[in-house]
Amino acid sequence: MRAIAVLCMVEVHTAAIIPPEGVTVGDPMAFVAAAFGGMAAPMFVTISGWGMYMSAQRRRAQGFSGSDWVRWIVPRVLLLTACQVIVNLFLNVERGGRFEWQTPGVLTLLAVAAILSPILSRIPFSFRSAILLLACASPVVLGDTSGPELGWFERVGSEGIFEWLERLFVNGTYPIAPWIFYVILGTLVYDLRESPDVREKGIIMGLIATALTILISAIEEVDWALTEGDAVLTFFPASTPFLIVSGTMAVLAMRILEGSEARGGEPAFGDKLTFLEPSGRLSLTIYVSHFAVLGIAAMVLEGEPRLALVPAFLATSIHTIVWIPLAIAHEKYIPGISIEGLLRTIQSGR
């Protein structure tokens, strides 16, 4: 699941840097790319929340003291924050990219999740469910504070610490409100790992809600989904319907891939997807590294006309798929050289 999520992130970021000529918002290919994009980050954050919560639960069971928690959390937070800055520098606006060096992003969101993970591991399921509902409703509560009128470069820019904190908490690319929704969702899915029937009921409710959003779109005669603008589902800023639909799809994808494991059986595809496992174990390294490639592409393509459909499609596909064999080769020849390996080294013995 983690591998699929990070590869979807690679695909949507590549498509944004190398958009094909002549493809409009209503084009079927644009819809497919947008679907991957809309699902990539929610899946990535949900599975990351799942993993952090699992790690926190395990360490809580080991009787971690306050100092143990600090030694576990601080390196993780510092590394994720440093990686976010590196990503921002790789794809900086000064070189045809998309980010300011200080832009908060998905990795700073995960850094906050790491800080919260010991607390979340102690909060009862019912209370976390209530927090999930509050996070889901937060776009409605925030209203214009979430910055629906902000353009991209306003959303990634900030003047001073106060505006930076605004971007981190409420109106950046992946602000804590409402994106903490997916972290909490990951913790709930983990707690329900042995209760597939309960998860399936939740998925059915989510699919019904998804159908209702499509119906509302048809009745109101507005777009169903757009990256930003006037639509039922919007990514920037994330709307409540977007949270519900993408959260449902993330949990559905996890349930499909799980197969009958929770009931003592096999995963849905058996061993057919094991070739993706190295990519999942290197998800952070792949996430950071692919921005280095995109940064070069952004510099080369700056000021140039867009590529034709076929070359753009091939470039996006190749750049997405190539990380699979690279991850396999990495595990075979240099398994210790990675961001994940660096974190393990820093935290060794803890």
Protein language model annotation of sequence segments:
Residues 1-350:
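Alpha-helical transmembrane segments and their immediate juxtamembrane cytosolic regions
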